[in-house]
Amino acid sequence: MANFPDLLKGSSCRSHCGILTGLGVGPGDPDLITVKALTCLEQAAVVAYPRGRQGAPGLAQRIIADRLAPHQHQLPLDFPYVLEAEILEDAWQKAAEQVWQVLRQGQDVVFACEGDLGFYSTFTYLAQALAAHHPNLIIRRVPGICSPMAAVSALGIPLTLQSDKLVILPALYSLADLDQALDWAEVTVLLKVNSVYPQVWALLQRRQLLHQSSVVVRASQLDQEIYDDLSRYPELQLPYFSLMVIRCP
């Protein structure tokens, strides 16, 4: 991880420091925020969240927008949608610096992120960056509903049953990974399937699994879309927040 500036180094973070609380605010429907997360959000003086793309509000910001009061300070943080390690580490460093500026003054910060904190969450990187330099910093976590659970709810099916094995692939860089998952698990979930949909569709056609496969776009949001039985949809144009559920017989 990239080095932090002197401001962040060597701090013992004594009792005057604020508390960092991560809030999983669910997959998109504001009513799916847990009671505990909503309580923490409404009591917060400083609310941080990932900044959206190209100046547009991000998903977490949109989820909590109607819950925020005018007196609450909002702190958008930049987490770029890239794979380059140096760019990501630099972004985590800068986000940690911004949050630390608040915490070191004794103010608490809540960080809202879509889904659940433990499921491919940006909060993990922020918390790790701060904890590495401030081991006595109090960090709390409030779990939320992640997108696969919202997706299967929309489809009206269980995610798993009895002894079903489950594989979740956050991104697909090789079709061999999907082949291996389908050989092993009864249920496979593909996140961010938008960029590889044609290749995945062809693989599922070869394995005769299209009828048991579905796509949910923007699960639980007002503009949610459901595509069941993918044999009917060989050429879908999907947005970023799209996931696929595949059930092997």
Residue ranges, per PLM feature:
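General small-molecule cofactor/ligand-binding pocket signal
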Residues: L75, R140-V142, S214
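A polyampholytic, Gly/Pro-enriched intrinsically disordered region
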Residues: K94-V102, P158-P170, R232-L243
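Class I S-adenosyl-L-methionine
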Residues: A2-P30, V35-A37, E42-I138, D223-D228, ...
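Solvent-exposed alpha-helices and their adjacent loops that cap or buttress functional pockets
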Residues: S12-C17, T39-C40, L103, F111, ...
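Class I SAM-dependent methyltransferase SAM-binding "motif I" and its flanking Rossmann-like core
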Residues: G115, F119-W184, E235
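Short, acidic/turn-prone active-site loops that include or flank metal/cofactor-
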Residues: P27-G28, G52-G55, F79-P80, D164-Y173, ...
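Small/polar loops that bind or transfer phosphate-bearing groups
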Residues: G24-V25, F111-E114, P143, P170, ...
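A contiguous loop/helix-start segment that scaffolds small-molecule binding in enzyme catalytic cores
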Residues: L20, L182-P249
